[in-house]
Each structure stands twice: as C-alpha cells, then as structure tokens.
Amino acid sequence: MSIALESWSFPPAYDDNYFPDAASRYWFPKRETMSPGERERFILERLKTVCAYAYEKSTFYKRKWDEAGFHPSHLKSLEDFESKVPVVYKKDLRAAQERTPPFGDYLCVPEDDVFHIHGTSGTTGRPTAFAIGRNDWRAIANAHARIMWGMGLRPGDTICVAAIFSLYMGSWGALIGAERLRAKCFPFGAGVPGMSARCAQWLNMIKPTAFYGTPTYALHLAQVAQDEGLNPRDFRLKLLFFSGEPGASIPGVRDRIEDIYGAQVIDCGSMAEMTPWMNVAGSRETSGLLCWQDVVYTEVCDPATMRRVPYGQRGTPVYTHLERTSQPMIRLVSGDLSLWTDEPTPCGRTYPRLPQGIFGRIDDMFTIRGENVYPSEIDAALNEMPHYGGEHRIVISREATMDELLLRVEADAATFAKGADAVAQFRAEVERKLLKVLGLRTLVEIVSPNSIQRTDFKARRVIDDRAVFRDMHAQVENARG
C-alpha cells in the first residue's frame, strides 16, 4: 500500500512555507477527518516502516525484539503490533543510557546529527537525555504548528510562553510551534524570583492572544497580578493552553481559570520523551485530548497486560512515534491513567479522544483504608467548591497500623474574614464533599489564604509521611537483629 497523505513521509519532509486557507478549521483536512479504519491502514504501513528502521539502526530495539521473538517482518496487522511488540518503560531508557552514554543505544542517527539536547532534571536519579536531530526538530515544529492551528491560533497572533527554558521540552515545543505558525513569539520564561510580577506587567502591556504554561502557574500568576492591582481579564487573552500536569481537563480547574482570565482553556501534552508532545491535545471546539494518531500512535492499554482496552474504559496510554528518526519511541508506556473514546467530536476530527484528559500517574495513586485515591480527584472536588482558596496539600501519614489522609485546604479571604464559624462550616462542607467523591472520611484542616506555598511550575501537592514510619520500622527491625 502506497502512502499518499498530505506531507506524510518517513523521514518527515515538511514544507515550512505551507499554510492552509485561513478559513480552514484543518491544517491537513484529509489526515484529520478520514475514517478511522482508513487511517489505521495508513498507520499500519507507517509502523512497518518505523519498526524496520529502528531494528536496523538501533541495537536497543534489535536486542529487545530478538529476545521477544519479534521481527518487523512479522507485522501484518495492528493486532500484531499490540500483541508482538514489547513495551518500553522509562527504566529501560535509563539503563540504555547507562550502558551507552550519553544518549543510549536507541539513538538511530549519528551523534553529529543531534541538533538539540534536552532531558529530565534527574532530581530522583540519573537524568535521561533527549537527543533530537535537526530534521526531527523541524518536524516537531510543523506538528505543533498544525495542532496550535487546531486550537484556533493563526499567523500574526502573539503567543506568550511562560515556562522554564532549560532542559524542559514544554517551553521549547510551544516556542518552535509558534515560530512555525509565523506567530509573534513572546518567550517570557519562568522560574526566577520576582518574575511573575513582571510577567503580569508585560501581559498587561503586550495583550497577547495566547498563553502557554501550566495550570498551577496560571492560577499563581493571576493571584500575583491581582496583588499588583491588575485584573487578569485586562490581559485580553483569548486562549490559555497547558501541559505538564493534570488540570486543564478537570472541569473545576478549567472553569476557574477561564473565569479568572475570561479566555478559553485547552489541554495538551503527553510526555517529553514523545516530543512532539502536543500529540495529545484539544482543539478550539473539542475538549479533553484528541489523539493525533498520524503524528504519534496512541494505544490505551491495560497496565497488567499492555493490551488495548475497549473504548470507554480506563488504561495507561502507550505511545509510538511515527515521525521521529533520532530517538524513536516504540510502545513507550506513559504510566499515566486515562480513559478513551471514539465518539464523534465537535470539531469533526476523527481521532480517538481522552475526554477527561490525563487523570494523573498510576504511581501517584495511593490507597487509604482499601480505597484507591488519585490526587486529581481531590483537585477536581475542591475546585468545584466556591470558598476554596486555591491551594491545598495532601498529607498521608501512618497512625498505629492504619494509613490516614489529612487534607490541608486554604479557605478564600472572604470565608476567613467571617471568623471561626464560617471556617468550621467550610471544613464540614469539604469533609462531606470528599466522603462523597472518595468514599472515605478525611481529616480536614482549613488554613488561611495564601499560607501554602505557590509554584511557577508543576505543583507538588502530596506529602507522604509514611516513609518516616517505614524508616523507623526498618531501624527497629534491624536493632532486633
């Protein structure tokens, strides 16, 4: 089967001067609206090409697939891909880079062809390096421009990128997409003390069309702006698009940000390893996350079997690059949790969709008295409450033989100003809400507005004090000999 789709080749060869008609909803109409069955036939042909390429160019994939008894010639159907191609975990990438530093033996281009180096911070262990070739960088820019077009952005719009410019791929991905879109790029950055107040001043002065960052930072920035005497609605933003953490698909969080800024919120973003990370992203008309399957092939799988779950069920997204040549990821397990559907979309795109976005990470889940709890469930519940002050912390502790959950929640200024009775009433409301949502009773402590530290990047809201108990228990056991 020959592949005859708009600018779809391997290696990718996009025309950097191409633009659709300004009135078009779609960048590539055929690729975005073709029947799912037809698209899957194209995807199968591309998977055959990508797998053959990786097997030839990468000792990592050759070794892994030989051990699993898989050869690219075995790939006759998407069922073959799902059942015969072993998944890759992040730990496999770290091991590969320890074995073959610095980029691992899954680098499929000569090191001299590497154009950009990004990676993880390494705060919890060895950092992972992302090597991106020059042609891949161009393809990423084209993919992100196309997806930003679907968000309603157009050449000449001003796009503020308010995220850290360092190893973090989020900021760079948004920037190069905006550049390819021929937008006015406003790479403000983040992470420097006092920068949020300056960002608010600049937004008030420049009046950009769109803002990219994290939901946590957008809420923090709004508070800083108000403290500076500025109204975030005066920034005249039309769109805020986010990645890096759950939030933009949580109705309470999304609605709150939209109300503060008077602008639409769109969720996007999978994994830095999967750059172009906008491969799952909403559109102007469609909420949640569309799986742009002709950029990155997404399967939502049962974490136990790594086989696709039916539409309408939960699982973990597993991603495969269809356009990357430098460090192609083939069946990389995200470790996130989501639900997918193939229901028709308001925008007319025929991709599968994650209607509730990413719930969180599977390893973020904790169990309290037999109930599985996800931090995003607590986020969503609190953001639906009118007297919530905007920040909270989840403290898990060990009392005797039982795990306990304490929720430290800010009340808004109006509630706190009314005194102890109003605070007590709000605490009772939070307790009732969480009992309904989580199915368990939760200890709730109400604290004053702005008493919990904000962040200009990803929020870390879970404090697990059970580690202290485990360490103490281990010391006692060691002392007993």
Segments from the language model and where they lie:
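Nucleotide 5′-phosphate-binding alpha/beta core
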Residues: M1-G119, G125-N142, W149-G150, M205, ...
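ATP-dependent adenylate-forming carboxylate-activation enzymes
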Residues: F186-Q201, S376
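AMP-binding/adenylate-forming catalytic core of the ANL superfamily
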Residues: F211, V318, L322-L438, F457
